[in-house]
Structures are given as C-alpha cells and as structure tokens.
C-alpha cells in the first residue's frame, strides 16, 4: 500500500503534465498517450490484470475522478470494483478493457475523456475511441448494463488549464448520442455540478477534481440509477 501511495503521489498525472516535457524524439501521438509512460498507470494495470477474474456486480471505469473515490464505501450495499486510474485517457482504457470484460460485470459506469482534452486530442478522435470502447463492451459483454457518464464541468479560474466548458458540452452531446446508438443509459451529471457556467467552487478544490461534497452529488446520481432499475425489475 505504501508503495502504491508513493507512486500515486509522484505520478506524472496526465491532468498536470505538459506534453512538451516528453523527450524530443517522441512523436505527437505518443505525447497524446502519455498515460502509458506513467509508472502509476503501469502499476495499477498490472495489479488489475493479476486478479483472478470473477463475476462482479459493478465496475467503475475511468481516470482520477473515479480512482480517487472510495466507491466500495459509498455504495456499501453493492459489490463494487474501482477500475479508475489517475491520468487515464480513452486510449488507456482501450489498452486495458480486456480485464473489465473478463470480470463479466452486471454494470459498468464509464467516465473518461477529460485527459484527452487536456492533451489536445481532437474531439473526433475522442469520440472514435469512445465508440471502440462501447463496441467492445457491446460485443464481448452483451449482458452488461453500461452507463455512459457525462464529463464534468471545470472551473477555469482554478484549474490553470485552457479547458473550455463549451467543448466539454460538445463532447457530452456526442457521448449522449453514442449512448442512444448502443442502447446504453446516459447519465448527465454536468447540470448538477455547474454554477454560472463553471464547476461549482463548493464542489472542488482545484477546479477539476471533486471534493467530498462534489462526490456526494455524484454518488446520489449513481444511486438513482440503481433505484430506477430496481423499480423497473419489480
């Protein structure tokens, strides 16, 4: 645990990494997939790959927003696996989707893409990667209920990153359309976190990640999907 915490503390978090810090001989495509170069990503992926696969109820799949939260405690009435990796991208998720599929989860809650945007990945490329993720889940795990979550707003005054909430909303609309295409449920939490067009400062310390109150809002939204489906199954 101490080693993992140290790696997390010292990781080259994609949310804070400038692609120009990569070696000069690296290609642009490698720069935009810098998540592969972090020891934290490699360590977490190897840990997940080492687990004996068993049928599971719920998997949360994503980046630091997922990774940082104690989903098992927040959803203590449900069997939950946290498959978040701080700094991850849509490409990183594609690189490790096999482990998720092998677990044969009843549900997958997917939140990914903000790090792609920070890296300057074109929206069309993010959408293409996302479609590949959903293709794999639909084809190889057809009984899994997939919940595509909207990207969260950011607070540009706090982040220090040139992120644009208008672009985030554009991507969210595309994710909603993909959800409909694959007959998956789209969870739009963006409106519940936004205030005056920005991530509500009461829900964040850095303008990008959530604090405890922000996670409480998110958890409430997730629980509503459990309750809705339980009622539908009665």
Question: Where does each model-flagged region fall?
Answer:
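Catalytic His-Asp segment of secreted/periplasmic serine-dependent ester chemistry enzymes
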Residues: 153-234
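A short helix->loop->beta-strand "cap" motif at the edges of active sites that frequently abuts
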Residues: 141-145
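Oxyanion-hole/transition-state-stabilizing segment in secreted/luminal serine hydrolases
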Residues: 66-79, 90-128, 136, 147, ...
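N-terminal secretory targeting modules
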Residues: 1-57, 71, 227-234
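Charged helix-capping and loop-helix junction motifs
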Residues: 123-133, 164-172
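Short, basic/glycine-rich phosphate-binding loops at helix/coil junctions
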Residues: 18-26, 74-80, 108-112, 198-199
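Second-shell loop/turn segments in exported
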Residues: 82-86, 115-123, 161-162, 204-208
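Conserved beta-strand elements of the Class I
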Residues: 57-61, 81
């Amino acid at each position: 645990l101490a080693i993992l915490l140290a790696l997390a503390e010292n990781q080259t978090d994609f949310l804070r990494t400038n692609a120009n810090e990569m070696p000069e001989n690296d290609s642009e495509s490698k720069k935009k997939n810098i998540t592969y170069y972090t020891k934290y990503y490699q360590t977490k992926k190897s840990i997940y790959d080492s687990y004996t696969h068993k049928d599971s109820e719920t998997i949360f799949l994503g980046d630091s927003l997922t990774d940082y939260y104690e989903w098992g405690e927040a959803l203590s009435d449900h069997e939950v696996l946290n498959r978040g990796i701080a700094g991850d991208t849509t490409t990183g998720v594609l690189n490790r989707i096999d482990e998720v599929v092998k677990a044969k989860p009843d549900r997958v809650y997917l939140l990914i893409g903000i790090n792609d945007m920070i890296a300057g990945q074109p929206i069309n490329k993010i959408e293409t990667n996302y479609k590949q993720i959903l293709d794999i889940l639909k084809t190889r795990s057809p009984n899994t209920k997939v919940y595509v979550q909207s990207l969260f707003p950011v607070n540009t005054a706090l982040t220090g990153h040139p992120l644009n909430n208008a672009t985030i909303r554009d991507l969210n609309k595309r994710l909603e359309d993909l959800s409909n295409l694959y007959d998956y449920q789209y969870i739009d939490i963006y409106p519940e976190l936004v205030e005056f067009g920005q991530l509500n400062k009461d829900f964040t310390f850095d303008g990008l990640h959530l604090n405890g109150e922000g996670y409480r809002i998110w958890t409430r939204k997730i629980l509503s999907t459990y309750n809705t489906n339980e009622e539908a199954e009665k």
